[in-house]
Curated annotation (Swiss-Prot):
Ranges where the record places region C region: 1-140
GO CC list: external side of plasma membrane
UniProt topology in membrane: Single-pass membrane protein
Compartments it resides in: Membrane
Protein's recorded name: T-cell receptor gamma chain C region C7.5
Domain of life: Eukaryota
Chief place of localization: membrane
Amino acid sequence: DKKLDADISPKPTIFLPSVAETNLHKTGTYLCVLEKFFPDVIRVYWKEKKGNTILDSQEGDMLKTNDTYMKFSWLTVPERSMGKEHRCIVKHENNKGGADQEIFFPTIKKVAVSTKPTTCWQDKNDVLQLQFTITSAYYTYLLLLLKSVIYLAIISFSLLRRTSVCCNEKKS
């Protein structure tokens, strides 16, 4: 039922390991999401960039989205392999040119170095300065609110007094 001219080959979206995962667990997880392909027969496996051995990886269930399918696969890399590049290989009958689609992933060490987190508040003095600034702003707004309430009371009193004076003169 698919149009012959429609591109129904797998469209990959890749996700790289987080810095927190690599630092905390000493592993990194590459995720490859394959979307908008038809039919649902697909094979996904992982290899090192310069290797031929198929690595142990995991796959999610096949999901149907509208008239196409979606599948995801992930590879968890141990610390000893973080310096190696990896590739996700996709076999599908509608791949462009009929060849296997290869998605390359950079080394985890490159990812960890290029996404080094920055710390905004490195010093306790900075935290105290921030707390002082917030407290000052709070009291400033509180003072302005109090001033506005007093101003409202004075204006209301003046208008009510003026109205009562005007009304009393007309009755006389």
